[in-house]
Amino acid sequence: MIRKQFPFSSILALLLFSTLSTKNLFAQKFENLAPTPPMGWNSWNTFQTNISEQLVRGIAEVMVSSGMKDAGYTYLVLDDGWMAMERDPKTGDLVPDPKKFPNGLKPVIDYVHSKGLKFGLYNCAGTKTCAGYPGTRGYEYQDARFYASLGTDYLKFDWCNTEGINAKEAYTTMSKALKAAGRPIVFSLCEWGNNQPWLWAEPVGQLWRTTGDITAQFDGIKSYGNWHANGVMTIVDMQDSLRKYAGPNHWNDPDMLEVGNGLTPAQNRSHFSLWAMLAAPLIAGNDLRKMSAETKSVLTNKDVIAINQDLLGIQGFRYSNKDSIQTWFKPLTNNEWAVCFVNRSSVAKQLDFNWQNESVIDNLYNKSLDAKSTTYRLRDLWTKKDVGTTRTPVKTTIQPYDVLMLRLTK
């Protein structure tokens, strides 16, 4: 046999080409993980650390049977408390709590996947999670490999017990670890907005929290001892100035939904409408197994969800705030628009909005709603009825905490 000898330079070039090809392959694999705001369910708002294999299986079943999966809800995310209080003493790996998950997590995740859903886990950038379980600090690459080996599709990464840590560096390290693990995993930065993640997180993850935690009240701040949580409208007030940072694959996250957790039906509608207008991730946080027909009708309103999931990916903007009625506009594909009129007060308010007298311009994206030269048809997305055109004013009464949400089409 005659052996052919190749110059060392040729071999080096071949190896370099192979390496670059492999890197490009993985880079392509991790692109476009969240072209629209992620939709799913998270365990924390209702269950905190009281989670189990039985709960996960039950939620997965209801996500399908209730129509939520069909409406676009994809991710089932286990929040804090899924792991044991100590890592494996030999390997250093995280260990699923054997009481909550006696069969481990892999069978549970496989079951979620069998339902056509995706699975998410939680951890923290600090030494411990917010509930005192093992954090990821110093274990980023090991934990990322562990998540990938289980088939995890989504990671929520919190910010407790992080004294002395630089936020950008910590989240960048975890982002690199997830990419190196060889599996596409949506990365949710739960940094509470403390270090302005909207300024640096676009190349790091697909969504980032803009505020502290939400709580199930419509407005104001609720104290929980040494920390506090924000009502729906309090969080909304913090979002308008951040819209330029949102877009496909990089979303502002005003926190999970509290629909079905004690808000009134009107407040549920307003909450869901505003999250849709904000192009916010729609992550439900109620007990899906026990939700009322009213809650289900809000969470699965496909017309409202379509506003949130519009492929243009533009976060809406607050147009006006008059007499307790906030007006929000959101540009959509095909030169269509969505508008929300939200009554923030505890008394009914009269709305009189004359399209011919208003100048609706989105300066950030150079878009305008010209109702003088173009007639738009109006559809009420909650009553699911056509309600006229922009040739005539909108005159109606908006009940306390309720919303009028319209889609404008030519």
Q: For the regions a protein language model found, what residue spans apply to each?
A:
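N-terminal module-boundary/linker segments of secreted carbohydrate-active enzymes
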Residues: Q28-E53, R57, V62
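Carbohydrate-binding surface patches
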Residues: W275-L278, I283-G285, N321-Y365
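Glycan-recognition surfaces
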Residues: V186-D287
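Structural recognition of the beta-strand scaffold that forms the well-ordered cores
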Residues: L33, P37-S43, G72-D79, K118-N123, ...
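Catalytic cores of secreted or luminal carbohydrate-active enzymes
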Residues: R269-Y319
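Bacterial Sec-dependent N-terminal signal peptides
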Residues: M1-K29
